[in-house]
Swiss-Prot record:
This is Small ribosomal subunit protein bS18. One of its GO terms (cellular component) is cytosolic small ribosomal subunit. The gene is rpsR. It comes from the Bacteria. It comes from Legionella pneumophila subsp. pneumophila (strain Philadelphia 1 / ATCC 33152 / DSM 7513). It holds the Pfam family Ribosomal_S18. Keywords: Ribonucleoprotein, Ribosomal protein, RNA-binding, rRNA-binding. InterPro entries: Ribosomal_bS18 (IPR001648), Ribosomal_bS18_CS (IPR018275), Ribosomal_bS18_sf (IPR036870).
Amino acid sequence: MSAYFRRKKMCRFSAEGGNEIDYKDINLLKNYITETGKIVPSRITGTQTRFQRQLAKAIKHARFIGLLPYCDSHR
């Protein structure tokens, strides 16, 4: 029985040249939040620590301004 081989995830931001993450780029930020509005951890996305911190800061900034929701729906 062969063991399951998990491929190493690559950091998208370091591969593109290490650009700064902008809080106004909603399409990019939506890739890193779940359907319920939570920030996806770096062990799942494969982002480096430096860029994960920038992502979290940008997502929180976009939430504060109102570009992203804090959660999916209020009941």
